[in-house]
Amino acid sequence: MDCRSFYLQIAGCITAEILSCQLRPGQQMQSIRRLSVQYRVNPHTVQRAMDKLKREHLLEKCGQRLFITSDRELLRRSRQQEGARLVGAFLEDMESLGYTRTEARQMAQQAVPPSWR
């Protein structure tokens, strides 16, 4: 269960879509109203998520419209930071389950699918 505020969850979903290139650099975002219907929340909640992404420079405002940033270097750095955050969260979770660092590393290596080797 995700205990974060709805606007943070929405911002996280959109960030994941941006960093995985499901949303492309320069692509126009859907309207606040359309996103509020999609996420089943109040438009103000979506607006807060969009404001957060603008502060992080993942979204750019042009007139009344929002676009995914075209700054590929920013996107590359953001993707690396998110990857590091996910690895850190994995290691913390493994530690909370009682695994040693060595055991966690071994399990991670064993879980790598052959197509990644």
Where are these regions (language model features)?
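Extreme N-terminal segment that seeds HTH/winged-HTH DNA-binding domains in transcriptional regulators
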Residues: 1-29, 33-37, 78-117
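A general secondary-structure boundary signal
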Residues: 7, 43, 51-54, 66, ...
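N-terminal helix-turn-helix
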Residues: 28-61
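Minor-groove-contacting beta-hairpin "wing" of winged helix-turn-helix DNA-binding domains
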Residues: 31, 64-71
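A short, flexible beta-alpha/helix-coil linker loop
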Residues: 73-75
